[in-house]
Amino acid sequence: RSIKAARGRILDRNGVVLADNKMVCTVSVIHNQIEEPEQVIAILVKELGISEEEARKRVEKYSSIERVKSNVDKTVGDRIREYDLAGVKVDEDYKRYYPYGDLASKVLGFTGGDNQGIIGLEVVYEEILQGDPGMILTITDAKGIEVDTAGERRVEPVPGMDLRISIDRNIQEYATQLAAQACATKEADSVYIVAMNPQNG
């Protein structure tokens, strides 16, 4: 199983974090390791807020590993882990988080559901931000089903590198406020602000 690497942060010129990571979890089940299917179904329904039909479909599916839900809040993932249910795996994952909301969002861009950059700086600097994923290595039988008694080996992921940019968060926030005021006052469809050094253009 793959372990996602923590994505590199995006910092402003003063080191203020504009794009960060929030730890979440991915919950999966391994059919041939489940000992109490009805208990597993009940807990997945209760903790993940999915329907009994959906939980049962995942639990009863014959596959090496079946993902039940991604981007699960870490507190929920920790609770599920505490049940210590045979055949239920809770892996830590990361979700992109922007502390200042949509500030400079057209420049920063954003990531998709797989945490890969799809627009803006997030995609332009994907190679340095993404890091290298790790792996959980397990032994499977001829059908690809994990052998529970064989144990597993973990190869840790390598986090992505941080990216420091020339934007100043304070100036950007001030410019955003001025643009909003001008847009409202002039009843404009859109507003653009250009910052320029008057000495050299």
Regions found by a protein language model. Give the residues of each.
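Conserved, well-ordered alpha-helix/loop/beta-strand core segments that scaffold catalytic motifs
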Residues: 147-191
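Extreme N-terminal "leader" segments
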Residues: 1-3, 153
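Small/polar-residue-rich segments within soluble enzyme cores
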Residues: 39-46, 60-160
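A short, well-structured edge-of-sheet supersecondary motif
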Residues: 6-13, 187-200
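Solvent-exposed coil/turn segments that connect beta secondary-structure elements
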Residues: 13-16, 23, 30-34, 71-73, ...
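Surface-exposed patches in mature extracellular/periplasmic domains of secreted proteins
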Residues: 52-58, 89-94, 184-196
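Juxtamembrane extramembrane loops of integral membrane proteins
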Residues: 4-49
